[in-house]
A protein has these predicted regions:
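Short beta-strand motif preference
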Residues: 65-69
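Basic, Lys/Arg-enriched alpha-helical interface segments
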Residues: 1-62, 72-76, 83-106
Length: 106
């Protein structure tokens, strides 16, 4: 199964890109590899965190996380990113974004 990866946007801005673009190039490349694994259907490092939002956990650094929702079986919506230190706040923000995404689809 292959998945399509898209970024959630608010007013033309991507919260995921805002976070990702501030990372150093080596870290960004490593995180991109994890995202590409999801694109090829490998969700082994992902777990649900509530209300339809999932967390992609990285096995390096300060516990990097990428938050996403699944729109159907093959569309992944990137909602944001962060690390273990701000995990609770990032999860809450991702859940709010996911709810706005679903509401806008209706």
């Amino acid at each position: 199964m292959t998945c399509r990866i898209e970024e959630y946007t608010e007013a033309g801005q991507s919260p995921f890109a805002h976070w990702f673009n501030r990372l150093d190039p080596v870290t960004a490349a490593s995180i991109d590899r994890y995202i590409r694994r999801m694109e090829s259907g490998n969700f082994s490092n992902a777990k649900p965190v509530g209300q339809g939002v999932h967390e992609l956990r990285m096995d390096f650094g300060p516990g990097f996380r990428v938050y996403f929702g699944m729109d159907g079986q093959t569309l992944v919506i990137l909602l944001g990113g962060g690390d273990k230190r701000r995990q609770d706040a990032e999860i809450a923000a991702a859940i709010a974004r996911w709810q706005r995404y679903k509401k806008a689809k209706v």
